[in-house]
């Protein structure tokens, strides 16, 4: 959640007047996805920001006091092209503060087979590389991706805590037909 979300409440102020009731929503769009709401209320944005800000402050405070040692392992599944939750923020605000306790982030790469190439931005092809640890980390960094650009078969590339080299394991599973990104 960006820092600008703290101002979301201002966008809803006109909603106190009946002709401007729609101002209570940041976006109102048709609801076609049974697994996710498409419309988003201003109060939802404000509450999301407040919760995220409080959690980040608490994580940073506990990390500085070296009190995260008793935290159970954290397991996160994330698509590298998910724009709802920032993958770099997960890595910097959460995982960079975690102790070596068995935590793992699992990132789903885009389906790199040629049939989807026209749909993807060039930045999509380097997202995993930009997110991979450049120095040993305290958590396992795992990606699920195509075995290569010509294959629909997937592999797991996993960098163990304290390491920089990925171990590759074939999953013997293809990307589902017609899917260009696996997500949450």
Name each region found by the language model.
Residues 2-50, 72:
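Hydrolase active-site cap/lid region
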């Amino acid at each position: 959640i960006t820092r600008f979300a703290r101002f979301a409440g201002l966008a809803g102020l006109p909603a106190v007047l009946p002709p401007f009731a729609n101002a209570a929503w940041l976006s109102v769009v048709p609801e076609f996805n049974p697994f996710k709401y498409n419309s988003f209320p201003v109060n939802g944005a404000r509450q999301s920001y407040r919760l995220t800000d409080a959690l980040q402050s608490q994580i940073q405070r506990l990390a500085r006091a070296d009190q995260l040692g008793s935290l159970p392992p954290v397991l996160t599944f994330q698509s590298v092209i998910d724009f709802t939750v920032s993958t770099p923020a997960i890595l910097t605000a959460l995982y960079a503060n975690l102790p070596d306790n068995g935590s793992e982030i699992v990132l789903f790469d885009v389906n790199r087979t040629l049939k989807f190439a026209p749909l993807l931005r060039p930045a999509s092809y380097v997202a995993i590389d930009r997110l991979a640890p450049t120095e040993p980390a305290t958590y396992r960094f795992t990606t699920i991706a195509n075995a290569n650009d010509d294959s629909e078969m997937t592999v797991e590339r996993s960098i163990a805590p304290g390491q920089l080299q990925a171990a590759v394991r074939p999953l013997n599973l293809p990307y589902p037909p017609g899917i260009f990104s696996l997500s949450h």
